[in-house]
Amino acid sequence: VDHAAVTAPTAITGLKYNGKAQKLAAPGETLEGKIMYKVNDGEWKEEVPIAVNAGTYTVYYKAVRGEGHGETEEQHFDVNVSQKEIGIEWTNTEVIYDGTEKLPTAAAKGLAEGDTCNITVTGGQTEAGTYTAQAAAIDNANYKLPAETTVTFVIRKADFELTGMPQAKTDLVYDGKEQELITAGSAKSESEDR
């Protein structure tokens, strides 16, 4: 194959994951034969290579005349498909204290159709107060967290309403045994109303 008769394929730059197959190269041309491509350790093919997932791909190419009439030396270039940045939707950022650990919930926004992406949130707290939680990791390698990964959340003190006043017991007579001196009162927390 005459090298002068070959226009080499070129890497497509600026690719970002979108859930669809994207071409990794602008096709090359040859006046004699055809251009063959392979990606990483894949098979040689005539079709311009495509990829769906984020990552770095090594595209190899060569011009082949066919019928054993020669081919150019294989060349290669790298093409990067970058991760898509997700948005984060926070919920449960204001809760009532109940003695259990509280943590906001983070949901990924801006995903390609059919994709899922779970977010691991850290910074859970138990006591009433104001805290910061962080989206620490995601489980889909086609995406990346945004620059801002924290949220402020509040655990409010439970408000109690006295629903029954303790009362002193009257007419107690000594009988040598332990006796209750009052009737127990009762209280209801605001969280029980919800």
Where are these regions (language model features)?
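Solvent-exposed beta-strand/loop surfaces, strongest in extracytoplasmic domains of secreted
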Residues: 1-194
